[in-house]
Amino acid sequence: IIQKAKIVGDKTNGFFDITLGDIKILKGFYVNKKKIKRIDTRNFSYKDITLSNGNLIKKPFGYVNIDLSGIAKGYAVDLIYNYLKTKSITSFLINIGGEIKVHSKKSDFVTLGVDDPTKQHQYIEEILINDKAIATSGTNVDTLNYEGEEISHITNPKTLENISNLNLLVSVIHKECTIADGLATGLIAMNPSEIISFSNDNNIATMLTIFENNSIEKYYSLEFMKYVKN
């Protein structure tokens, strides 16, 4: 999972960074938070995390907190998917916290709905996939009030600031749910105006949803449009 996280870090130009644990601890996103000093600058990133002897993780400093929450659910989905593929199961769908991967031998594609963030049990889009995954990251999930401002758990690793726009969703389709999960987390940390252009430049299947009250705006990368049900 560390190796996959570093791959996603590279794919997002560093916007997905597993060394942001200290920022979340400082802001209060973890119940068992430690006492740490305010962080204004950092001299390390995910690039400084190394693996040796197969599974030995080496950190640049002892106080670096590795946070895998932005990729762990997708990784778990892939583990289950790979296990089920070894069994005589015709079709299955795995869903862990909204990170989904499907397999079907009965049909070429499986229809999935992308949830409407403003209404329960309704969809804003339908997609057709098979042996692929879709993962979604939202700034409206896991928020808290920090120094008088409502902030998201999503952190911009370039500025070390948590995203304050709580009306964003990013969905990514990829053959690996691990990668889709990490990409969605990294992309949503970017400036919203750059997400689709970055996705197009890097052939990422991305859907950006901006919502407020009952108003919804949807934007698609060219790669994502291949999966939209007409």
Give the label of every model feature segment:
Residues 1-230:
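Mature catalytic core of soluble alpha/beta enzymes
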